[in-house]
UniProtKB/Swiss-Prot annotation:
<comment type="similarity">
    <text>Belongs to the class-A beta-lactamase family.</text>
</comment>
<feature type="signal peptide">
    <location>
        <begin position="1"/>
        <end position="28"/>
    </location>
</feature>
<dbReference type="GO" id="GO:0005576">
    <property type="term" value="C:extracellular region"/>
</dbReference>
<comment type="subunit">
    <text>Monomer.</text>
</comment>
<dbReference type="InterPro" id="IPR023650">
    <property type="entry name" value="Beta-lactam_class-A_AS"/>
</dbReference>
<keyword id="KW-0378">Hydrolase</keyword>
<feature type="active site" description="Nucleophile; acyl-ester intermediate">
    <location>
        <position position="73"/>
    </location>
</feature>
<dbReference type="GO" id="GO:0008800">
    <property type="term" value="F:beta-lactamase activity"/>
</dbReference>
<feature type="binding site">
    <location>
        <position position="133"/>
    </location>
    <ligand>
        <name>a beta-lactam</name>
    </ligand>
</feature>
<feature type="binding site">
    <location>
        <position position="76"/>
    </location>
    <ligand>
        <name>a beta-lactam</name>
    </ligand>
</feature>
<dbReference type="Pfam" id="PF13354">
    <property type="entry name" value="Beta-lactamase2"/>
</dbReference>
<dbReference type="InterPro" id="IPR000871">
    <property type="entry name" value="Beta-lactam_class-A"/>
</dbReference>
<protein>
    <recommendedName>
        <fullName>Beta-lactamase CTX-M-14</fullName>
        <ecNumber>3.5.2.6</ecNumber>
    </recommendedName>
</protein>
<keyword id="KW-0732">Signal</keyword>
<dbReference type="InterPro" id="IPR045155">
    <property type="entry name" value="Beta-lactam_cat"/>
</dbReference>
<comment type="function">
    <text>Extended-spectrum beta-lactamase (ESBL) which confers resistance to penicillins, as well as first, second, and third-generation cephalosporins. Has cefotaxime-hydrolyzing activity.</text>
</comment>
<keyword id="KW-0046">Antibiotic resistance</keyword>
């Protein structure tokens, strides 16, 4: 026979499970929010994935939260965080110069192309990758980590069993439907972004640096940020690729409440489809209105 005391202990233990497994209780109005997201997805003609974590009470809103989506440049957050992790024990690492050769340039290098035949520090490369989505900078971070597998290994080390990086820039953006390479799920990315920016996956100094870089992003004005009140502070990383893949992941500080973590992934069936940042903005607006 189970006593009331044992029952209380069981319920107390069960209450901790969402924090460990990421299956926190949903908002009471989640069904309505999900219906609005479904309508948005239907009207867009693509596939939408959304994950929200409200850190005030660990509630979540998920839409296709456990389906895989191509990450594209949102994977740059993991690479930069992995380098920051290395810097916890290698104190001068972020000041280490990295040579930029003409052959290093790929398809999008707004910062690195200014330093050809010169050097950039790992800190400068991280900022370029996160704030300008510079692909050469991303490749230099990947090389510092020993290849794409090194980025994935860091993800595993901080408890993310879903993230996988298989290629470098720009091929990691092919976003072929059904291809598991360079993918994650909205739920997994939201949990990891929370740990990196609000949790203890990084040391305090490194965490603050990552947040500063994300807040300084220059590529996200038309995505998640566009769907939120202008008074809210946002740190985000966008991504885009083939099949009209359009992504944004963000940490959000609303006025007068605890931070939110929001992941929005969107991809389409046509390889040459246009990106749809408006879909991400609409998803963010639906989430904000449902709080």
């Amino acid at each position: 026979m189970v006593t009331k005391r044992v029952q209380r202990m069981m319920f107390a233990a069960a209450a901790c499970i969402p924090l460990l497994l990421g299956s926190a209780p949903l908002y009471a109005q989640t069904s309505a929010v999900q219906q609005k997201l479904a309508a948005l997805e239907k009207s867009s003609g693509g596939r939408l994935g959304v994950a929200l974590i409200d850190t005030a009470d660990n509630t979540q809103v998920l839409y296709r939260g456990d389906e895989r989506f191509p990450m594209c440049s949102t994977s740059k957050v993991m690479a930069a965080a992995a380098v920051l992790k290395q810097s916890e024990t290698q104190k001068q690492l972020l000041n280490q110069p990295v040579e930029i050769k003409p052959a290093d340039l790929v398809n999008y290098n707004p910062i690195a192309e200014k330093h050809v035949n010169g050097t950039m520090t790992l800190a400068e490369l991280s900022a370029a990758a996160l704030q300008y989505s510079d692909n050469t900078a991303m490749n230099k971070l990947i090389a510092q980590l020993g290849g794409p597998g090194g980025v994935t290994a860091f993800a595993r080390a901080i408890g993310d069993e879903t993230f996988r990086l298989d290629r470098t820039e720009p091929t990691l953006n092919t976003a072929i439907p059904g291809d598991p390479r360079d993918t994650t799920t909205p739920r997994a990315m939201a949990q990891t972004l929370r740990q990196l920016t609000l949790g203890h996956a990084l040391g305090e100094t490194q965490r603050a640096q990552l947040v500063t870089w994300l807040k300084g992003n220059t590529t996200g004005a038309a995505s998640i940020r566009a769907g939120l009140p202008t008074s809210w502070t946002v740190g985000d990383k966008t991504g885009s690729g083939d099949y009209g893949t359009t992504n944004d992941i963000a940490v959000i500080w609303p006025q007068g409440r605890a931070p939110l973590v929001l992941v929005t992934y969107f991809t389409q069936p046509q390889q040459n489809a246009e990106s749809r940042r408006d879909v991400l903005a609409s998803a963010a607006r639906i989430i904000a209105e449902g709080l």
